[in-house]
UniProtKB/Swiss-Prot annotation:
GO MF annotations, alphabetized: DNA binding
Name the record gives this protein: B3 domain-containing protein REM-like 2
Xref: PANTHER family: B3 DOMAIN-CONTAINING PROTEIN REM-LIKE 1-RELATED, B3 DOMAIN-CONTAINING PROTEIN REM-LIKE 3-RELATED
PROSITE patterns named among the record's database cross-references: B3 (PS50863)
InterPro entries per the UniProt record, alphabetical: B3_DNA-bd, DNA-bd_pseudobarrel_sf, REM_fam
The organism of origin for this protein: Arabidopsis thaliana (Mouse-ear cress)
Amino acid sequence: MLFNVSACDIRDKPMPSNNDINKIDQLERVKKVRKNSSQSEAGSSSSGNSSFVALVKASNLKEDALYLPQDCTSSNGLNKKCRKIFLTDGGDRSWEMDLKFDKNLDSFCITRGWRHFCDENGKKLPNQERFVTVRLVPDCLRNKRLYLSRRFLKNNGLGEPKMVTLVGTDGTRILANLLRESTGRMSLGRGWVDFAKANRLKIGEYFTLESIWENDSPILSLYGTNTSKSDKRKRRENFPVACEKEYVSTEARNRNEPEKDKNTEEMINQASLSENRLVITLVPEDVKAGMLRLPSHFMKANGIDKVGKIYMLGINEMEWWWGDLLTRDGIVSVGCGWRYFCESNGVKIGKSFTLECMYKYDTRPVFKFCPKSGK
């Protein structure tokens, strides 16, 4: 929403609501001030600070308040005595609103009337169906697939396989194909991993995509990222309301796994941080056998009591490796490519590395691989 600041009505006391004559006099005075102010700005101001763009957000609608940019208010003669302000629709209609100065933020704020002004002019929040929030998990990179909500795809005309343009925060565009699997689920395929790397998306991070169409071409634009699911206040400011409620599992569903284990996250207790790290020496015998051994006390301290996959993130948190925990005694099958993963992360045979248990995804532990032991 574009605002063009042209006048401010200065009042020390509220205008009596039962005095029609005073209302007319005040409105006439406002029109006169607006006219004189416009003439002086046209002659003396060329800085372009007489207008600014206001974003309609869930937060300012809920609070019925809008903070004005400091450079705009200072260049247009607003002072702390201003009590009322008029907003127009560019035509004959105008809305009178309260104006106050927030000392803590050193900014002017429109109060009591902002929500009504938005309703009257049809200014609403962006269409919530255009947004979807997903979490980057290791399988997204290993399988080179990003699974998206069926409802999101259907509501945005993406129900059929096609090429989609992915747009990063810096405007970089990468083509990706939207695929339909035999199960009916749809995902982003070729091009998705390059997009994740180009925008430095990290494992465990939440990010929001916005669906945009340009000349009949589908576009998914990176709207924002957030590393903490619990930081609700920050997400309310940056993401649409609907995005706070819908999280999409980005991993292909295994029919043998109980439904209750999906989409769960268990953060490691920070009080036992020292027990989250394990120093291991890369010995030739283990590399040849494709095995990794985790001590029982380490597994117990981190709540690892189920066999299954474990994930290890490289030093750049984009390259990763996974293995199968075969027994509760800590025997892990890491495969024949384990050696190359270690070497690519700066660890050769005979050297030590550190595994730090970061968190769990779907009850599966995720470790950070560090080339220097004890750090």
